[in-house]
């Protein structure tokens, strides 16, 4: 379970980015955080990950095995390491897997799942496309077998086929390894395919919180309706 109680946060004392955030996410629930750029979505993710501490309020996680997948994969990889080295480091660090043969077998299985060529493993991060690197980024996090996954705009660099591939993989992982994941996105179609609950942020505050089946209900917050209408164009 993830629980935020009256969480307030600001990068300086004059302006709060998030104000009085109250969220409870039970095990097994996948949640999308929806809102425009600058509304506090990524800051909220950073707080859950423990990268920042709230100015006020409390954050509780029942499981400490929480990992992020960030929007820009190039900043998530060591530029001097091959893709293979970075992936195997995750297997060693998070799972204690040191046997090279076992590591290779896991990598080959995941390469097939993510529809990536094994020849790319010898490349540096700067030598593969942004879409390929983002798929490797997702792969690395899943190889680490986290219980909670925080996904921050992870499909922004992917074409539509690769995007659906990653979504299918994450949905399958929900059944196997993950307790739940939180998806930060401005793309409503991604959230509709991935989560069963949406929380809407506006100006650092929660203005709506509903099950995905209730997205088009007439009693949705006016801002939620505005986002839905904007996306439909």
Swiss-Prot record:
Name of protein: Nickel import system ATP-binding protein NikE
Broad EC category: translocase
Amino acids binding ATP: 35-42
Membrane topology: Peripheral membrane protein
GO CC term (a single one): plasma membrane
Signal peptide location: none
Native source species: Staphylococcus aureus (strain NCTC 8325 / PS 47)
Keyword Zinc (UniProt): no
EC number: 7.2.2.11
Keywords (A to Z) from UniProt: ATP-binding, Cell membrane, Ion transport, Membrane, Nickel, Nickel transport, Nucleotide-binding, Translocase, Transport
Subunit note: The complex is composed of two ATP-binding proteins (NikD and NikE), two transmembrane proteins (NikB and NikC) and a solute-binding protein (NikA).
Family: Belongs to the ABC transporter superfamily.
An MF annotation (GO) of this entry: ATP binding
Phenotype caused by lack of the gene: Deletion of the nikBCDE operon strongly reduces nickel transport and urease activity. Mutant shows decreased virulence in a mouse model of ascending UTI. Insertion mutant shows attenuated growth in several infection models.
GO biological process terms on file: transmembrane transport
Biological role stated in the UniProt entry: Part of the ABC transporter complex NikABCDE (Opp2) involved in nickel import. Probably responsible for energy coupling to the transport system. Required for full urease activity and plays a significant role in the virulence of S.aureus during urinary tract infection (UTI).
